[in-house]
Amino acid sequence: MQFRPSIALVLSIVGILSLEISWTDGCTCFMETRREKCQRSTFGFIGYPYFAGRTNIGGMEYNRFCFFIVRIHKGLSVVFGEPCVYSSVSSAACGTGFYSGSLSIVNGYIESGVKQVNLCGWNERWRSVPSFVKFMFLTQPNWCYA
């Protein structure tokens, strides 16, 4: 009879450890406001995603998202070229995505010459942004600058 509780104990410990391991492998972002995320970014724009595909850059798989850009709010020279951004395929590496045809705000950074976005940046559907944040963002030219 004492054998069964020890098996249950071992199984519960293994279960807890596996859960802990899976949490440490996931994406971890700092708790930041939308403004702080925007200030931390190298470039930013509002646009409609019209193309999504996969590509390989330097041996890494990325999702590629191209946009019809409506408004550039940061990094004009960066955004003015190819209207596409790249995000890791893996959500464990903080990969993100966009809804095709849905107006989105996109903020990212340059790494190894590639425009990258991730879950830790301010990247979301424009309609999900609270009205007050939209008002501050659209009326204060330096809102995204520290």
Curated annotation (Swiss-Prot):
Keywords: Secreted, Signal. Prismatic layer of shell (at protein level). Expressed primarily in the mantle with highest level in the mantle edge and lower level in the mantle pallium. It is found in: Secreted. Residues 1-26 form the signal peptide. The keyword Magnesium does not apply. InterPro entries: TIMP-like_OB-fold. GO terms for cellular component: extracellular region. This is Uncharacterized shell protein 1. It comes from Margaritifera margaritifera.
